[in-house]
């Protein structure tokens, strides 16, 4: 029976939580952006949130992956985030200031949760790499000695 350390359990729970809440944020933002698009005559309004909020996901991953030219990924990330917040706020505008503030939360959380998931993944990779960094054969000889 394998016993997981408290850190590994916390890491797995935090990762699952960020993915789940990020998915909910995406869903809320999707609804607002698609309704805003439909109200403004976009025939395939369901595609707009996929492009905008999908851009947040793609650009976040690109900021992690690109060591060179990272400025471009960051520019796309900022642009996608601003478009999503603006669209969500515009959708809520008829309902007043409080609704507009609430509407800004899902796209901002989508951005934050995506970045947090990447950080958690990196942490898992770094903590897991310690145990597999030395060759298996060497580990076996070291334990026998």
Curated annotation (Swiss-Prot):
InterPro entries: DUF2637 (IPR021235). It comes from the Viruses. Putative excisionase. This is Gene 34.1 protein. It comes from Mycobacterium phage D29. The gene is 34.1.
């Amino acid at each position: 029976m394998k016993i997981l350390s408290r850190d590994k359990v916390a890491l797995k729970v935090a990762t699952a939580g960020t993915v789940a809440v990020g998915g909910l944020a995406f869903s809320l933002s999707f609804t607002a952006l698609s309704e805003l698009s439909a109200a403004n005559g976009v025939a395939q309004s369901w595609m707009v949130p996929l492009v905008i909020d999908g851009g947040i996901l793609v650009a976040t991953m690109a900021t992690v992956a690109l060591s060179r030219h990272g400025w471009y990924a960051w520019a796309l990330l900022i642009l996608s985030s601003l478009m999503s917040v603006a669209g969500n706020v515009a959708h809520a505008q008829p309902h007043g200031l409080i609704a507009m503030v609430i509407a800004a939360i899902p796209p901002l959380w989508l951005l934050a949760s995506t970045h947090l998931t990447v950080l958690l993944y990196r942490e898992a990779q770094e903590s897991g790499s310690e145990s597999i960094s030395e060759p298996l054969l060497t580990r076996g000889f070291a334990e026998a000695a």
